[in-house]
Amino acid sequence: MFMGEFQHNIDSKGRLIVPARFREGLGDRFIVTKGLDNCLFVYPQHEWAEVEQKLKSLPFTRADARAFVRFFFSGATECEVDKQGRILLPNNLREYAKLDKETVVVGVSTRVEIWSKEEWDRYNAQAEASFEQLAENIVDLL
């Protein structure tokens, strides 16, 4: 399980250090794709396979299902950790998530998310303001 929040910088070549705490769970190769809320989702291979199966079961006749599957898979790439614990994030993914230099790497149970620090701070400010309401809204889902 992934949890915690870590701040790291992207270097001039687009490389980001993967927190040591997450490396073991992710393995040497894992999938990075466009996520929701302007961040990147990072999945270990086995978790990606489960997500892929679920998405493949969506009815291709529905326009919204096709659009989501295209969005999700077109942005996906396999990344490999180098000897210094870094990954090279492709330019298209850095642009999508507005990643420039300062980033926040967050553990979210079965996946890791990569955020620009500015977007993460903005998201957290909104979420904190409505945290109690969010909790009330989802309590029935638990």
Swiss-Prot record:
Residues 5-47, 76-119 form the SpoVT-AbrB domain. GO terms for biological process: negative regulation of DNA-templated transcription initiation. One of its GO terms (molecular function) is transcription cis-regulatory region binding. Forms oligomers. It comes from the Bacteria. It comes from Desulforamulus reducens (strain ATCC BAA-1160 / DSM 100696 / MI-1). Signal peptide: none annotated. PROSITE patterns: SPOVT_ABRB. Keywords: Cytoplasm, DNA-binding, Repeat, Transcription, Transcription regulation. NCBIfam families: division/cell wall cluster transcriptional repressor MraZ. Its main location: cytoplasm. Belongs to the MraZ family. GO terms for cellular component: cytoplasm; nucleoid. PANTHER family: TRANSCRIPTIONAL REGULATOR MRAZ. This is Transcriptional regulator MraZ.
